[in-house]
UniProtKB/Swiss-Prot annotation:
Pfam families, A to Z: Ribosomal_L33
Protein's recorded name: Large ribosomal subunit protein bL33
InterPro entries the record matches: Ribosomal_bL33 (IPR001705), Ribosomal_bL33_sf (IPR038584), Ribosomal_zn-bd (IPR011332)
Domain of life: Bacteria
Gene assigned in the entry: rpmG
Gene Ontology CC terms: cytoplasm; ribonucleoprotein complex; ribosome
Source organism phylogeny: Bacteria, Pseudomonadati, Chlorobiota, Chlorobiia, Chlorobiales
NCBIfam families attached to this UniProt entry: PRK00504.1, PRK00595.1, rpmG_bact
Keyword Translocase: no
Family to which the UniProt record says this protein belongs: Belongs to the bacterial ribosomal protein bL33 family.
Length: 60
């Protein structure tokens, strides 16, 4: 039988540059495998409030 999906968790990515500029932050939700990726994710995603791609870091 197949094993359960307990290794994959849902995380939230939040824009880091919008806070510095005083604009509303953009948030994305995604999943990650906590066994393969133990550190926090940092991805470049589009922020519609700033109308450009910015760094989004994983928050708790």
């Amino acid at each position: 039988m197949a094993k359960g999906k307990e290794n994959r968790i849902v995380i939230t990515l939040e824009c880091t540059e919008a806070k510095k500029e005083g604009k509303p932050v953009s948030r994305y939700t995604t999943t990650k495998n906590k066994k393969n990726t133990t550190e926090r994710l940092v991805l470049k995603k589009y922020n519609p409030n700033l109308q450009r791609h910015t760094l989004h870091k994983e928050i708790k």
